[in-house]
Amino acid sequence: LFQMDNYTDTIMLFEAAAMGEQNPLTAMMTATAYNVDNFETMASDLAVYCERTIPLSTGAQKAVQLVPFSYARYWHGYLIWLRPLLCVMSITGVRVVQYLVLFALLAVILWQLRRQCGLRAMVWFAVSQLAVTVFWVPHQVQYFTTFCIAYAGCAWVLARPRRAGQLSIALVVLGTCTAFCDLLVTPIITLGLPVAVWLCCLPQRAASGARQCLPVIGGSLCWGAGYAMCWGLKWVLATLITGRSEEH
């Protein structure tokens, strides 16, 4: 994560600030927001978007014509928690909350790894997260969303020994949650991290190569099925409810 995904975060913030006269169901399906051409002017663009006016040098206000854009192919599940938080705090406060949540989950995972898999597994997991600069993840809403889902999956896997069938069911849920919340930026992390920590557990380490590979392949297919079904369902519902088959 050596580059901040400000463009995607800008889209998320504009979706959170979206205003319109559509009924809630149609608004959820269309996910209409203001079209952003330059994420570097996000602060001023958000002010214009919310006020729908531009201040003039004379002190008067000039009405602006907003250009709508629909992100109808995504569920935008992150709005379930982002909108309420933005009602009571600024984006800086949201980032503080994200830091607290993510590093609390990381602490739980490291403790579970130490207990279930040993000190070496815990250290290498911590090193891997530092290698991807996890300390910057909560600074971005987009990265936080997928890392939070992935860490929650890791915590569930490590809570007690899990059979391959249980892992596959969990990966269906993780794939569905990822499609519901993610904007197709870092989805695969919600598959890779839970599977990696599952393989670190003692029963899997003692298994033969085939007994390790087959659950991973099957679990990956389950994750993909959950992701595809959730994402495809949004396309179908958005088309049926809005009468449009593409974003605009």
Name these PLM-found stretches.
Residues 2-71:
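Interfacial juxtamembrane loops and adjacent helix segments
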Residues 73, 80-98:
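Juxtamembrane segments of multi-pass membrane glycosylation machinery
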Residues 75, 127-166, 180-187:
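Membrane-interface micro-motifs in multi-pass membrane enzymes
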Residues 99-123:
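Transmembrane-helix motifs of polytopic, lipid-linked glycan transferases
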Residues 153-158, 189-221:
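Perimembrane helix-loop-helix junctions
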Residues 167-194, 215-230:
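Membrane-interface alpha helices of multi-pass inner-membrane proteins
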Residues 225-244:
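Transmembrane-lumen/periplasm boundary regions of multi-pass, lipid-linked membrane glycan transferases
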Residues 248:
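Conserved small/polar residues in nucleotide/adenosyl-binding loops
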